[in-house]
Design a protein with these regions (language model features):
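Bacterial N-terminal signal peptides
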Residues: 7-17
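Acidic, serine/threonine-rich low-complexity disordered tracts
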Residues: 24-100, 107-221
């Protein structure tokens, strides 16, 4: 995973793992930010540590109907001083359901976009459950320690957000009015993430047709 994407995961983990306080208030916020709409996006910059200068965008760039369910293409686009990459996953919803991956496309730098075969998705789902920032926020948000509501000044404007904090110094400011909820975050390692933009007109960052990645060969016993 490119460094910017890994750092966003770390923010979610360190800023949202905390002791319960005002659990109902946090739970309502986390439920609200879990509702996604086609086209929603939020962009961020990072400062401090190895991710200094990195940029990240989260977006819902597509949807598909399968049976009675609507699936969404959730995109994480990250770029930093040394690497860049795009990951798109087809999921039944945001938050806890993000672990149920039904499709995945990845693109690293100038390399061709690749679509992963279905037999690899179970393994990827397990990794997403542990590392995906959106999933971690939904899972940890409701049990975080609530400091209180604050007005936070970020490049995207002044936004009222719920301040969450953990015992190790990680912090996050969350708002139901922001796509994906994250307004600002500070990790225990001194890295900062701030919201730079948001909107409802996101398009896929992958414009080419993805190549089919061959499936893994399973040896016969």
């Amino acid at each position: 995973m490119p460094r910017p994407l890994a750092c966003l995961t770390a923010f979610a983990l360190t800023a949202l793992a905390a002791s319960p306080l005002h659990a109902q208030e946090a739970a309502e916020l986390c439920k609200a930010i879990g509702n996604v709409t086609l086209g929603q996006w939020a962009s961020y910059t990072m400062s401090g540590g190895q991710a200094d200068g990195a940029k990240i965008r989260l977006a819902i760039v597509g949807q598909e109907r399968r049976g009675d369910s609507t699936l969404y293409w959730f995109e994480i686009n990250g770029s930093g001083p040394r690497d860049e990459g795009i990951m798109q996953v087809l999921v039944p919803g945001f938050g806890l359901e993000t672990s149920g991956i039904r499709g995945m496309v990845v693109k690293t730098g100038a390399q061709p976009a690749m679509k992963l075969p279905d037999q690899m998705l179970a393994t990827v789902s397990q990794r997403m459950a542990a590392n995906n920032p959106a999933l971690l926020i939904a899972r940890r948000c409701a049990t975080a320690q609530v400091v209180g509501w604050e007005t936070v000044a970020v490049p995207a404007g002044s936004i009222k957000a719920l301040h969450l904090k953990d015992s190790e110094g990680g912090e996050a400011w969350m708002s139901r009015d922001i796509p994906f909820g994250i307004v600002k975050a500070h990790s225990k390692d001194g890295e900062d993430l701030v919201l730079t933009g948001r909107g409802m007109d996101a398009k896929s960052s992958i414009t080419e047709k993805p190549m089919e990645l061959p499936g893994m060969m399973i040896p016969h016993q």
